[in-house]
UniProtKB/Swiss-Prot annotation:
Annotated positions binding substrate: 212-213
Active site, renumbered: 140
A GO molecular-function annotation: carbonate dehydratase activity
Localization in the cell: Secreted
Taxonomy of the source species: Eukaryota, Metazoa, Ecdysozoa, Nematoda, Chromadorea
One Gene Ontology cellular component annotation held by this UniProt entry: extracellular region
Signal peptide: 1-16
List of glycosylated residues: 188
Family the entry assigns: Belongs to the alpha-carbonic anhydrase family.
Alphabetized Pfam families for the sequence: Carb_anhydrase
Domain of life of the source: Eukaryota
Keywords: Glycoprotein, Secreted, Signal
Residue ranges of every copy of the Alpha-carbonic anhydrase domain listed in the record: 17-274
Protein name: Putative carbonic anhydrase-like protein 2
Length: 337
């Protein structure tokens, strides 16, 4: 189990993200850090960087352990000798090679219309977010060392939206999650294919940030892919059955919501390899599969009048939010799918 989860699960009624930095000296960045995650992605403020190359995934099938930590469902890739691994190269982390270590799933309460993604796009929160966390194996021997070291980690974020069918590998995880409804339960994943969780796109946005769990180390290069993958409402409800307790209780303690509140950019640049001008002229504004183009890179007052899922989830521009003071539910209450 990840060390912070052990402590966080001991005091579930006391510990919250706002207090992490006060609980342990190694967690001080959770309060004092100026490059914290997650953040809101403002499409109008993205900086196009033509030098950002596509992300490359090397490797295919691995063995992994799927665990209910009491805070999050986490897939940890087994580091076995003479067994395949998943390496990530290219993108903003060149020339380094990053080795996939774990995958976490963040989600909201589906039956209450709550969204669960950690990152938001134009103040819109999505139903779920999958995060693939890899460490710099070119510089560091393992995840623990890399976690506290410069250029140590790469986080690839996949937005999950509601669709008519669930993406195949996500469906497999959904089925497996039914066997780990309670804290501490685990199940083995054989022939697990992490790359199948990624959408078919070479476009992304990227920024320098932190882990979204204690100790919030500011050693993470974030890559948020431009297209979502999909999950049905019924399958999302299955994830909602996961609980924080070790056994069934008279009053269930569900895992949701499972995301950290938004943090300020504090002047950080958010770069993209999407040529905004080119996209606006070649991509239909009604394209449902593109997260950022659908949201609009430039101010577009007309989108508030559109009768689609995006406009229903959009926070009206008349409402002014400060990122650090926004409550988790403020974004999710913008509407439902």
């Amino acid at each position: 189990m990840i060390p912070w989860l052990l402590t966080a699960c001991i005091y579930p009624c006391v510990i919250g993200p706002d207090f992490w930095g006060l609980l342990h000296g190694d967690w001080r960045m959770c309060t004092a850090g100026q490059m914290q995650s997650p953040v809101n992605i403002d499409p109008s403020q993205l900086l196009y960087d033509p030098h950002l190359m596509p992300i490359n995934i090397e490797g295919n099938i691995v063995e992994a352990v799927f665990e209910n930590t009491g805070q999050l469902p986490v897939v940890t890739v087994k580091d076995l000798p003479n067994r395949p691994t998943i390496n990530i190269t290219g993108g903003p982390t060149m020339p380094y090679r990053y080795k996939l270590h774990q995958i976490s799933v963040h989600f909201g309460r589906a039956d209450e219309g709550e969204k669960g993604s950690e990152h938001t796009v134009d103040r819109v929160r999505f139903p779920a977010e999958i995060q693939l966390l890899a460490y710099n194996s070119a510089l560091y021997p393992n995840f623990s060392v890399a976690m506290t070291s410069p250029r140590g980690l790469l986080a690839v974020s996949v937005i999950v939206d509601i669709g008519k069918t669930t993406s195949v590998e996500l469906r497999r995880l959904t089925v497996a999650s039914q066997s780990i409804n309670y804290k501490g339960q685990t199940t083995n994943l054989t022939d697990f294919q992490p790359s199948a969780l990624l959408p078919k796109t070479s476009h992304y946005v990227t920024y320098e940030g932190s882990l979204t769990f204690p100790g919030c180390h500011e050693t993470v290069t974030w890559v948020i892919l431009n297209n979502p993958i999909y999950i049905t409402n019924d399958d999302l409800q299955i994830w909602n059955e996961m609980q924080k307790t070790e056994t069934k209780q008279p009053e269930p303690s569900y895992m949701t919501p499972a995301y950290r509140p938004l943090k300020s950019l504090n002047g950080r640049l958010v770069r993209t390899n999407i040529n905004v001008g080119s996209k606006q002229s070649t991509v239909s504004s009604s394209c449902p599969s593109n997260v950022y183009v659908e949201m609009g890179y430039q101010a577009n007052p007309g989108r508030n009048k559109r009768n689609d899922s995006v406009s229903r989830r959009y926070v009206p521009t008349s409402e002014v939010f400060e990122i650090d003071s926004i409550r988790p539910d403020d974004v999710s209450k913008a509407g439902s799918f």
